[in-house]
């Protein structure tokens, strides 16, 4: 009987240890170069590689699930995942719902439109601009530019397709993301200057964890500091942003 009890305790301990070593990340994988689905149906991108590097530092295993952007924080709250890494801006509004790590990427936003058609945001008055539903980009336009008609999309890739096909007049998104579009499509161009309003786009992008989970927050912060110091962060950055 003792052997059975000991075996059961060991088995229970092993299961707990295994669970503790796995960090389930949720993301929205239609946002290259931060995250996207590759030809092998795998989630890849800057965020994924960085998360893997952080997990390696803290001896954890990372798993990734793809979800709609507006379901990411609810998934975190309902404990379906331990962390969210999805090009998410650290904003005061979101900080009321989740804990963020220190910023891992400095961020700004940018309008894009058809080349030669618009040169300033003022010219988008009365026009249709695509945004991803539930993002700070959507809220920014609704609050600061009510004269612009926002068209919500479940992914920025769908918004880009509609822009290219003339169904909308512009798209508003993270500078790093839409700049990649400009490299691949000479028919698109930036409209106006970068937007850096901290009330909406915060102090950068962060990894979100549940409120109260300061242990995981600290582990990720420590790991992030290490990979920035040892050159790992720079290597990952250059892989995705210096092509």
Curated annotation (Swiss-Prot):
Signal peptide: 1-19
One GO CC annotation: outer membrane-bounded periplasmic space
Entry keyword annotation includes Transport: yes
GO MF term set: amino acid binding; ligand-gated monoatomic ion channel activity
CDD domains reported in the protein's UniProt record: PBP2_Arg_STM4351
Main localisation: periplasm
Pfam family, one: SBP_bac_3
PROSITE patterns: SBP_BACTERIAL_3
Lineage: superkingdom: Bacteria
UniProt keyword annotations, A-Z: Amino-acid transport, Periplasm, Signal, Transport
Cellular localisation: Periplasm
BP terms from Gene Ontology: L-arginine import across plasma membrane
Function statement: Part of the ABC transporter complex ArtPIQMJ involved in arginine transport.
Protein family per UniProt: Belongs to the bacterial solute-binding protein 3 family.
Oligomeric form and interacting partners: The complex is composed of two ATP-binding proteins (ArtP), two transmembrane proteins (ArtM and ArtQ) and two solute-binding proteins (ArtJ and ArtI).
Protein name listed in UniProt: Putative ABC transporter arginine-binding protein 2
Gene field: artI
